[in-house]
Amino acid sequence: MALHQASGRWRLGLLLALITAACWASLPIALKVTLEQLDAITLTWFRFLVATVVMLGWLAWRGGLSAFGGLDRKRWWHLSAAALLLIGNYVFYLLGVQHTTPANAQLLIQLAPLLMALGGIFVFREIYQFGQWCGLAIIACGLVLFFSDQLKGAALGTQAYLIGSAAVIFAAVVWAGYALIQKQLLLRLGSQSILFFIYLVASLVLLPFSQPQKVLSLDTKHAWA
C-alpha cells in the first residue's frame, strides 16, 4: 500500500500550523461561553453544519465535488472512519470543556499533535532529524510535567473535573487517529473534499441528538461566541 509522503513544503506547513494553534487558543473560551446556553451535542452539530455549508460552497465554486466519483470501497471506509473519529473528538472535547476549565482543556488537548507525530513515525515511517527529535522530546517532557501536576491536583479536585480531563484526553487520542487517516486519504482527495465529507456525515449523524431550536433562541453574547 502506498503511504503518504511529506511534500517538503515545511514553511507553508509551519505557517498553517501556527494559524491553527492561534485559532485553537481562543476556541475553548468561546465554547465555554456558548455552553452556558447550548448542550455539547447541539453545539457540535451546529459547528459541523456551518462548516458543511461553507465547504459545499467552496467545492461547488472550485469544481471539487467530482473528486468522490473515482473512490474505491477502501477509501470510503477510510472517509467514514475519519468522520466518526472527528465526531468523537468534537463531542468529547466539548464535554471536557463543559466539566473542566478552558485552560486545562487547551493544555490537555496538546497531547493530540504529539500522538500524531508519533503515529507519523510508526505508521508512515517518517524520518526525523536531530532537531525534530529534540523538539519532540521537549514537548513530551512538558506534557509529562503538566500531567503529573494535574494528577496531584486531581486528588483534591471534583469528580466533574476528573471526568472533564479524561474526556479531553480521549478527544486527543481520537483526533490523532483521525489525522493519520486523513494523511493517507490525501493521496486520492484534496483536504477540502475530505473535510466536506466529514462535516456532512457529522452534521447528519448528530442531527437526531441535537436541539436546533435552541440555536435560534441564543442571546447576542452567546450567538457571537
Question: How would you name each of these model-derived features?
Answer:
Residues 17-18, 73-80, 128-140, 188-197:
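Cytoplasmic-side transmembrane-helix entry/capping segments in multi-pass membrane proteins
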Residues 55, 116-118, 122, 153-213:
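Transmembrane alpha-helical segments that form core, pore/gating elements
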